[in-house]
Amino acid sequence: GLTGVVAELDTGRPGKTLAFRFDIDGVDVTESKDEAHRPFKEGFRADIDGITHACGHDGHITIGLAMAKLIAQNLDDFKGKFRFIFQTAEEGTRGAVPMEQAGVLDGVDYLLGGHIGFQAKTSGGIICGTNKLLATSKFDVNFTGRSAHAAGAPQEGANALLAAAQAALAMHGITRHADGVTRINVGVLRAGEGRNVIAPNGYIACETRGETTELNEFMFQKCMDIVAGVAQMYGVQYDVKLTGGTSGGDSSEEITDIYERAARQSPFIKDELIVRDLNFGACEDFAHFMHAVQKAGGKSGYLMIGTKLAAGHHNGAFDFDESALLSGTDVFLRSAYAINGKDA
């Protein structure tokens, strides 16, 4: 992505290449103007309606910049190389794949990442190892039929509205898989031009998810079978456009161990709020990075940083406890010392 940034610090001493990933994009939400909303009250509400940081990625940017500054200021304490990946387009799972293809993970031995909030809902808490990040495919289907007079010559038409509707219903009827979690959702259906016109166009926006990459592929292929069958049934053409996607993933045990030790040493984390590992049950395209690093023989892990939230993720009133910035930075920095400290 053109808005992504990658920076590297080289100590000049032999060691591992340790990368950190921080997602930086906003979401399509208008931020609250309620007087009780702290960002509005204190004058740092989003400037543009319809787009805001309602998922905590501004916090991730802050942690990433703090990490880069602290490691640069204390470079003599370290060995090896540090790479800071500020990733665009996590929302919609569109950013990791092109950045990985651009080579941002080349030579990486360890990759660390995480997120503010989600299941870590208490300030001072942490989830050290996040597992079962779901694989997903995001795709649009356009059906192209043929318009005709609905009463005078319906036989001359090819109804793309019915094709889109039939596809949506059939996709939601796909048999789930016994090997793990699978999901399907058709979130948008648009079609037609007029009440007395056979609809020449139909559009659906869809996503599949699976506990593993293989389970997601099972769901996606079933959807493709349905699209092809429905198109033949109604005599329409179709076009499928992949708009995003990511692999599934589990944190490496070694990274979970490192995070847990760092959390127990941190003055910003409460021991009773440390959770060793938890299944995520949702999608995050860090999983693509994680899978790529692990496939190449490296280690990767994803943590969740505890914070009290004013409202849920992707809500216009979203706000987090800024003590999470200290917690996240401290755990990542201690993990950096554990992996690439001079005495590690």
What are these regions (language model features)?
Residues 15-17, 136-138, 298-302:
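Structural motif
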Residues 61-68:
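DPxDG-like acidic metal-binding loop motif
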Residues 1-14:
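A non-catalytic alpha/beta surface segment that caps or lines the substrate-entry region
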